């Protein structure tokens, strides 16, 4: 059951990324908030290359697949992100690119430090710590997706399918925490509960916006 849910989570997130890429190219906009994308890339880079999962070949394959798909999503941000900048007389396209790279670098440094520091919560198991960190960034991501939808006032770059696959992708592996198949701490369980709230809220808002033709 544990392996099945982990593979299911990996597969649903792969589908989510592919759908984001498709919708971004179709609508000519980016479909993932910059800070969320930076954290994603940093997590995938760190736990694929710096702290790779020992003996878990399927996990390595999934992490690398996520990483390369996120690079494509980063491309869509570079391609379409600047047109969403409101004060173009203050922020140039070049400065936006530089700012983006800096955020990604800082995010990678954070992940490297956090992987080591948070491992003490899980008997120095960095692999388990990576799951805790993933839930923290998933909460940030879930909030940012809701914020992006509300700020844009439309579903460009977003879809109900993205919202649902994203939610199930996170829920699949988090079931392991609630059923004690994987170790967890109380704070993490609270974070997971918050993720479910914001993911379901995002699905509801996407449905409402789509139904009212706010595209």
Question: Over which residues does each language-model region extend?
Answer:
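Membrane-interface helix caps and helix-loop-helix hairpins in membrane proteins
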Residues: 52-57, 124-125, 181-185
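C-terminal transmembrane-bundle signature of multipass membrane proteins
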Residues: 144-148, 158-215
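Internal transmembrane alpha-helix with an interfacial aromatic "cap," most often the third helix
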Residues: 14-27, 44-97, 111-117, 206-210
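Membrane-proximal helix-loop-helix units in multi-pass membrane proteins
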Residues: 80-149
């Amino acid at each position: 059951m544990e392996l099945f849910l982990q593979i299911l989570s990996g597969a649903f997130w792969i589908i989510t990324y592919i759908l984001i890429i498709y919708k971004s190219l179709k609508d000519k906009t980016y479909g993932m908030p910059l800070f969320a994308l930076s954290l994603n890339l940093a997590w995938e880079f760190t736990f694929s290359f710096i702290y790779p999962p020992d003996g878990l070949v399927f996990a390595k394959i999934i992490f690398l697949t996520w990483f390369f798909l996120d690079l494509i999503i980063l491309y869509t941000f570079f391609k379409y992100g600047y047109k969403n900048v409101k004060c173009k007389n203050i922020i140039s396209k070049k400065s936006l690119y530089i700012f983006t790279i800096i955020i990604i670098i800082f995010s990678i440094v954070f992940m490297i430090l956090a992987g080591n520091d948070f491992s003490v919560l899980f008997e120095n198991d960095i692999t388990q710590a990576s799951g805790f960190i993933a839930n923290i960034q998933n909460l940030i991501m879930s909030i940012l997706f809701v914020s992006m939808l509300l700020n844009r006032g439309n579903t460009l770059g977003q879809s109900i399918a993205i919202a649902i696959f994203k939610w199930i992708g996170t829920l699949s592996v988090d079931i392991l925490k609630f059923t004690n198949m994987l170790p967890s701490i109380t704070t993490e369980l609270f974070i997971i509960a918050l993720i479910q709230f914001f993911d379901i809220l995002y699905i509801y808002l996407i449905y409402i916006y789509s139904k009212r033709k706010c595209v």
